[in-house]
Amino acid sequence: MPDVVALAAELLSINSSTGAESGAVDFVSKWLVARGWNVTIQEVSRGRANVWASRAGRGVTLSTHLDTVPPYIAPRLDGTRLLGRGACDAKGIAAAMLVAADRLAAAGEQRVDLLFVVGEEKGSDGARAANRLAPTSRFLINGEPTESKLASGAKGSLRVTVRTRGRAAHSAYAHLGESAIVPMLKLLPTLETLDLPTDAILGETTVNVGTLKAGTEANIVPALAEAELMFRLVGDVEPLRKQIDRWAKGRAELEYGSYIPAQHFHTIPGFDVAPVAYTSDIPLLGRWGTPLMFGPGSIHVAHTPDEFIEVEELRGAVDAYERIVKTLLSA
């Protein structure tokens, strides 16, 4: 059987930033074909593709993403840790899934599929494409760094752009203009007055003012100010949208952007369980079966210069994926 740490290091040595995943796709597909899997390469866009590997189907699909955020960071072993871009998000997870599925197949279990998508870190176009395939699995185990716990659910997200307008003028005659920044600075602190929903499992809805843009030069009264908000959702979005509409009415313009609903996931006995605050491809893979989320590593080091995964946890993830699959198939 292949060594999961060596396999993860091989995957990490391939630069597969979002939009340039072809090297990782080629590596994974060849690895699977060499081990007797039926492999489907699904084109997502020019030069980019998902990998779907199957045998008998009608069971459990192990899935994660092959793309990473930039910049590329080469892998290295440092004591008990494997470091590098994608170590925990999510190439280490992909390696653990590959080895677990291969061990199951070698033991005669044919009801395991593998799905590796591109584009998760930016727009999830790979998952959207994968949901147009014709899977037969009953369960989907999505791999994200959950610290080797089964996720009980995941917060959703809602992007909102807020705009305030003024009237441009030369700053020497500022009284002839109207700064768009002033009403924005008055409005944003009142976000604290919103009655944000809570959920017994997912916790509190949160809001982050992610960007604030206004003006072009210090000697110009700015005519436009723009803030981008990110709400992390724990329930139905419509009551929150109505609150936001009332909050901004008469004071700002709103533009609603991407929306991902909050999710509750299937769990099984024998594992620690906890919710996660981040989103994933799960809402876009509805045809792949009842969702679970599990993976080694911590989201708190993902996307950082020192991203890592503990070698012991990575090895343990192979056993954990096998155990989850066997439990689901016996249900």
Language-model features: where?
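Acidic/histidine-rich catalytic neighborhood of metal-dependent amide-processing enzymes
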Residues: A95-R159, D199-A200
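Acidic/His- and Gly-rich active-site-bordering loop/insert found
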Residues: M1-A87, E109, M293
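Residue-level marker for buried hydrophobic side chains located in beta-strands
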Residues: V60-L62, I141, R167
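Structural motif corresponding to alpha-helix initiation and N-cap regions
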Residues: R46-R48, S124, Y278-T279
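Metal-dependent amide/peptide-bond hydrolase catalytic core
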Residues: S16, A20, A34, T40, ...
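Short, surface-exposed alpha-helical segments at coil->helix boundaries
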Residues: S22-D26, A94, R241
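Alpha-helical metal-binding/catalytic segments enriched in His/Glu/Asp
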Residues: L62, G79-G123, V162-T164, A174-L194, ...
